Every structure is written in structure tokens, then in C-alpha cells.
Amino acid sequence: WIALAPFCGLLDWRPHIWVTGEHGAGKSDTVLEAIRVGMGSGHFISAKGSTTEAGLRQRLKCNAIPAVIDESEPNTNKDRLRLDGLLTLARNASSDDEAIAIKGTVSGEASSFRIRTMCCFASINPYIKELADQSRIAVLEIEKKPQTTATKDDFQTIKRNFLALDKLNFGTLFTNLMISRLPTLEANLLVFIEAAGDVLG
């Protein structure tokens, strides 16, 4: 996802992910930090759980930018309604033939948005109830490990590695590498699609 998301505007199909795990499993400190380091700050929209579909849509406009939405918890009816809107946006963004959103305005003139984002949701409880969303969103569950000296040492090693990569401006370097290999990426995507079709039907 980190490799593909910066090029979401070039893709015919844009998958999304939902990072989940119980409290203290390390969603923010590991996976979301890996996204920040791997893509580089400023190369994606970073939003919190109070974000609405309208807010994200207006922030995206016609720009092909990935979005990370942390704390996407479906705790209340209001939360679930808000997530329904965000999931509709993500669903429509998955394929180019569904990517045009037309909204009415108070002035009486329609406003058009071409939604070409790839979303990463993160929460303790994933909220994927529609079959259409299940085929578009991969759920990545983080297993919480017991607090031992070994696991604490591992976590500190991960943090040091992230810091070292960040100092090297790894996100920009990685994106530049992917740009230089776009023909290979496009060829590999076709292979992956064919292989996935054989497995998933």
C-alpha cells in the first residue's frame, strides 16, 4: 500500500486498507508511523476520526492524494453515519469509472470532484459491513504481544530504525525509486491481478 498509494492517480483500481488491533497493539507507533516514514510527511492527507466525507472530498478536490484516517471508531450512531460517508467516498474512489462525484451547492450550481484517493483507516474496531467494501478494503490486524523485556527491546529498535530512515528522507528516496521503475510496477500489477484472479476467482 505504501508503494502504490503515491501513484493512486495512475491506477485503474485503488485498494484501501484498514489497520486494526486492540488498544496498545501499536497501530500508531508502528504501522501508521511506517506509512509516514515510507511516504514522507506532506505526501498524504493525515486526518483524525472526526473527519467527514464532505471535509475529505473538499480537501482532495481533483487531486490524487492518499489519505490516512486514524481513530475511525464506530462508537456512536453519529460516528457510524460519518464512517458510512467516508466508506462511500473510498468505494467510489476505487475505480476510475466511479470516480466522478457531483454535488449540489447552495448557489444552485453543481460542483464536481474526481476522487482518486487510496485510504488507510485505523481503529480498534473495523467498520466494514457492506460486501462492496469487503472487496475493496484489506483488513490488517496487529496482534498485541505481551509486555516483556524482549518485546520492549524490539519496539525500541523499530523506533530507532524509523528515526534513522526519517533522517535520510526515506519517503522521498523511496518514491523516487518507484517513479524510476514505473514500467516494472505496471507490469507487476498485471501479474498480481492475474495471480489474484486465479486464487480468488
What are these regions (language model features)?
Residues 1-57, 61:
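P-loop NTPase catalytic core of nucleic-acid-dependent motor ATPases
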Residues 2, 34-35, 70, 120, ...:
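Conserved RecA-like P-loop NTPase ATPase core
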Residues 30-34, 85-93, 116, 132-136:
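Alpha-helical scaffold elements adjacent to nucleotide-binding pockets in ATP/GTP-utilizing enzyme cores
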Residues 55-106:
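Conserved nucleotide-sensing/catalytic segment adjacent to the nucleotide-binding pocket
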Residues 111-115, 130-201:
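Phosphate-sensing "switch" segment of ASCE/P-loop ATPases
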Residues 123-128:
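Short, polar loop motifs at secondary-structure junctions
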